[in-house]
């Protein structure tokens, strides 16, 4: 009897597999970290083979833990770190270069050239994005220009490009299917989010051959079947979405005005704007939230590059903690008279500043500043950055008074009550943490299960969303104002170090 859906959650630092039952409860979870490579300042790479082997290993482990076989699994759903770029040989499957990760800033010069040549208005109008190293298009161009012979081979159709979902799908199907979904395509700088097609003008500007690009499908569709020797029998692959869009689905943010924020390596807030794309006046992105039955639902997005990775820095870079769960209790012991601010621009700054060149800084240090104050500043930096996104979304959304009065949160950092309470305090709004916090994986599972007939239509699925805890604002208005002013001053100081105020 088909009773489960398998979600592949391929993230920045680890690959995970989560088996969901038909009632969306979790049957098993498996996780495997893989190495990060930092060959130069601002460069971040992954070995595609590490992504692949860790994905297969976790799928097998989750199935073994739950005691299920392929005949028990209705479908596989894939969600993935977005923008991360893989280029591989169509015939052999060999990657031409390590995967260039979404955090990577090596293409800042390419982006500067595109802006200088006046291309940004056309790119932004069609893609809803800005010209920034974050997105896949300039990463593809860099690989083609940097690997000897790659550009000529790509023009002949010998090379394929894919975001991580596309690469995994190609491997899972034994090289039979080269496809992606609309959410991942919308993050490449090559896809017109209004027409739902790869755009010839954008391909020409970025110098990317059309032959490299995958077919673009709905987020819930039959993409193909896994080859039998991977799991013992074929399993249908029926759902794909980028990780942040999958979280929108998993959080059941199906109504315009609903907003979710996911806290993993980075932080990403998305506001559902319905069937109409809203052009941001406050340096947010306009993107596709999901595509079902050929109909696109759009979102405003704010992207923060450093959230959970600030806690990793406390652990791995400074040695202040041994595990992430220690951070909240440590921060709680900080000296309340100190005002230490961390601006964690380790790889530049994302929304709403968009400056790839600045680097992080600490402000307000005294002789008495210690581990507790640094932990406090690291956690609080995530809340301040979320506030910046929140304020920009309120300004952009045409009915701000009726929109996103509650923030739905998910991701690893939401386990910290300290951080979630501080987030509610600084936003001056309730923060809702759901019972099922694996919302990214749940979104992928839902998209796959919807196509397979396991899960109901979105409105009925939304009825199953359950609140675990609501964090209510408790900070005084005076304290909130003082702290936000201090954060704004710290950000100005960092931006001034590059001689500007962002893009």
Swiss-Prot record:
GO BP terms: glycerol catabolic process; glycerol metabolic process; glycerol-3-phosphate metabolic process
Residues the record lists as binding ADP: 12, 16, 265, 308, 412
Pathway stated in the Swiss-Prot or TrEMBL entry: Polyol metabolism; glycerol degradation via glycerol kinase pathway; sn-glycerol 3-phosphate from glycerol: step 1/1
GO cellular component: cytosol
Leader sequence residues: none
Binding-site residues, glycerol: 82-83, 134, 243-244
Top class in the EC scheme: transferase
Regulation: Inhibited by fructose 1,6-bisphosphate (FBP).
Matches recorded under InterPro entries: ATPase_NBD, Carb_kinase_FGGY, Carb_kinase_FGGY_CS, FGGY_C, FGGY_N, Glycerol_kin
EC number(s) given by UniProt: 2.7.1.30
Catalytic activity: glycerol + ATP = sn-glycerol 3-phosphate + ADP + H(+)
GO molecular function terms listed in the Swiss-Prot or TrEMBL record: ATP binding; glycerol kinase activity
UniProt entry keywords in alphabetical sequence: ATP-binding, Glycerol metabolism, Kinase, Nucleotide-binding, Transferase
Binding site for ATP: 12-14, 265, 308, 312, 412
Binding site residues for sn-glycerol 3-phosphate: 12, 82-83, 134, 243
Pfam families: FGGY_C, FGGY_N
Family listed: Belongs to the FGGY kinase family.
Function description: Key enzyme in the regulation of glycerol uptake and metabolism. Catalyzes the phosphorylation of glycerol to yield sn-glycerol 3-phosphate.
NCBIfam families xrefs: glycerol_kin, PRK00047.1
The protein's name in its UniProt record: Glycerol kinase
Species of origin: Nitrobacter hamburgensis (strain DSM 10229 / NCIMB 13809 / X14)
């Amino acid at each position: 009897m088909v009773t489960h859906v398998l979600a592949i959650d391929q993230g920045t630092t680890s690959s995970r597999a989560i088996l969901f039952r038909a009632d969306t409860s979790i049957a098993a979870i498996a996780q495997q970290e893989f190495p990060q490579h930092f060959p130069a300042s601002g460069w971040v790479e992954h070995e595609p083979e590490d992504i692949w082997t860790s994905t297969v290993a976790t799928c097998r482990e989750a199935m073994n833990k739950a005691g299920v076989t392929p005949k028990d699994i209705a479908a596989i759903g894939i969600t993935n770190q977005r923008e991360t770029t893989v280029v591989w040989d169509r015939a052999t499957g060999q990657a031409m270069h390590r995967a260039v990760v979404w955090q990577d800033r090596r293409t800042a010069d390419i982006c500067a050239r595109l802006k200088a040549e006046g291309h940004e208005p056309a790119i932004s109008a069609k893609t809803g994005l800005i010209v920034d190293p974050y997105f896949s298009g300039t990463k593809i161009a860099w690989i083609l220009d940097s690997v000897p012979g790659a550009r000529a081979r790509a023009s002949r159709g010998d090379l394929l490009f894919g975001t991580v979902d596309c690469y995994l799908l190609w491997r899972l199907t034994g090289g039979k299917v080269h496809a992606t979904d609309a959410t991942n395509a919308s993050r490449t700088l090559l896809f017109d989010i209004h027409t739902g097609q790869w755009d010839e003008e954008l391909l020409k500007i970025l110098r990317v051959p059309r032959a490299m690009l995958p077919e673009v499908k709905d987020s819930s569709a039959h993409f193909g079947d896994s080859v039998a020797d991977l799991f013992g029998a074929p399993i249908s692959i029926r759902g794909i979405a980028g990780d942040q869009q999958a979280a929108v689905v998993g959080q059941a943010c199906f109504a315009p005005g609903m907003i979710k924020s996911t806290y993993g390596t980075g932080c990403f807030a998305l506001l559902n704007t319905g069937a109409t794309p809203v052009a941001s006046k406050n340096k947010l992105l306009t993107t596709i939230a999901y595509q079902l039955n050929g109909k696109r639902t759009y979102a405003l997005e704010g992207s923060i590059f450093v959230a959970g990775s600030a806690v990793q820095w406390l652990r791995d870079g400074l040695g202040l903690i041994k595990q992430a769960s220690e951070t909240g209790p440590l921060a709680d012991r900080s000296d309340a008279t100190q005002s230490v601010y961390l601006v964690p621009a380790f790889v530049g700054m994302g929304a709403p500043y968009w400056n790839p060149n600045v680097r992080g800084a600490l402000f307000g240090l005294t002789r008495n500043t210690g581990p507790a104050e640094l932990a406090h500043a690291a956690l609080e930096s995530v809340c301040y950055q979320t506030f910046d996104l929140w304020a920009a979304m309120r300004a952009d959304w045409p009915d701000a008074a009726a929109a996103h009065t509650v923030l739905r949160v998910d991701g690893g950092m939401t386990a910290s009550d300290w951080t979630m309470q501080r987030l509610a305090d600084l936003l001056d709004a309730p923060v809702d943490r759901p019972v099922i916090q694996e919302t990214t994986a749940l979104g992928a599972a839902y998209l796959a299960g919807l196509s397979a007939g396991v899960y109901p239509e979105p409105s009925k699925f939304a009825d199953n969303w359950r609140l675990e805890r609501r964090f209510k604002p408790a900070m005084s208005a005076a304290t909130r104002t003082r702290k936000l002013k201090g954060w704004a001053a710290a950000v100005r100081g960092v931006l001034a170090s590059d001689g500007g105020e962002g893009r």
